[in-house]
Amino acid sequence: MNPFYQQARFLISAARPDAFPTDEGMEVAFAGRSNAGKSSAINVLCNQRALARTSKTPGRTQLINFFALDESRRLVDLPGYGYAKVPEAMRKAWRKLMEHYLGERACLKGLVVVMDIRHPLTDHDWTMLGWARERGLAVHVLLTKADKIRRGPAMDTARQVARALGDAGIEATVQPFSALKREGVEDAHGILDQWLGLTAEPEARAASE
């Protein structure tokens, strides 16, 4: 566990671009389908129980949450997507906010896309990955809830996802991850370290290698 991430603290929740922190420094954003385990992953990576609040009502939170690691580095929790019961007006507002953040944020260095390892690459995941490709963003895929299946099938799924992304022209690293068992934390930290300028070389072992 890299102690650097344990100092993460809540900075601000933003419903509009004009509420975002100043566009400087470095940010890494986390995106994922509702119930994919995004908030739990952020909490485990920062070794905090309730840094990113989990919701029992998927799709309810439509804010972008910023967490400060130090004066110039931030983690960003994007709204969960893909929940069918969210009203159409809310979906449109969410999409506009996300397009603005992903398209205009100069300090954004990478995007972590969180997927349930049992249900990876949904249509909404592909939409998010398409935005990242258009922007030229670095992408890392966390296949969460890896404790739900055996290690062999988990690694097979990671390789299959990496292959599918490569076939789609999307450069990405992919790894299984379990918030419950805290598996994959060091690999994920290696990617974050690279994007946030904390190390010269990536330390994570990508399934695609």
From Swiss-Prot:
The gene is engB. Mg(2+) binds at S39, T61. It comes from Thioalkalivibrio sulfidiphilus (strain HL-EbGR7). This is Probable GTP-binding protein EngB. GTP binds at residues 32-39, 59-63, 77-80, 144-147, 177-179. The keyword Hydrolase does not apply. Keywords: Cell cycle, Cell division, GTP-binding, Magnesium, Metal-binding, Nucleotide-binding, Septation. One of its GO terms (cellular component) is cytosol. CDD domains: YihA_EngB. PANTHER family: ENGB-TYPE G DOMAIN-CONTAINING PROTEIN (PTHR11649:SF13), MSS1/TRME-RELATED GTP-BINDING PROTEIN (PTHR11649).
